[in-house]
Amino acid sequence: MPDVRILEPFATPRTKLGFLLDWRVTMKCNYDCSYCSGHDNKQSHPDKELCENMLAQALRYVDRVMKVKKKTMRSVTLNIYGGEALYHPDIEYLLEKSSELYDQYRDRWSLIRMLTTNASSNEKRWANVLKHLEYVQFSYHAEGPGKLKENYLRNLSATHNSGKRYGGVIMMYP
């Protein structure tokens, strides 16, 4: 048996070995599903300036990593989630800031901002948020209230009509 000293992903012409940056912008959620332990509504939202500084620092770090990667592998996914990310009172500002902060790196590496969300926000907020995303991961919650499910469907339709990429997951128990 060969002596394996290192394990690396196998790259093919179709494989793009990117970089995943997880950004949990809040622990709070506007739902209280029986199957979810991923939120804490007792904990306050992180301060807007702290979030902005953390994002700026993370992008600087990513830029350093991207400098040593092959040009064809310089791709970053910023996974924005929470509790429920859209429940953060400053999420529109933070997403807009993500666009501004990324501008200085745009010519060096690509960024896909992916929001994982229950999509329960109102129409105006959704339109503002969508401007600063490349991908939306919709999380449908079977236990969610009816009105918020209507918002989910409306926001899913708006995302589809915008031409943005999206996917979905259905959350239920049992």
Across the structure, where does each feature detected by a protein language model lie?
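N-terminal [4Fe-4S]-dependent radical SAM core
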Residues: 1-22, 68-72
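Short charge-dense sequence patches
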Residues: 1-13, 35-37, 110, 133-135
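Canonical Radical SAM [4Fe-4S] cluster-binding loop centered on the CxxxCxxC motif
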Residues: 10-53
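Radical SAM/AdoMet-radical enzyme domain recognition
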Residues: 55-79, 88-174
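Active-site beta-strand/loop signature of hydrolases that rely on acidic residues for catalysis
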Residues: 82-83
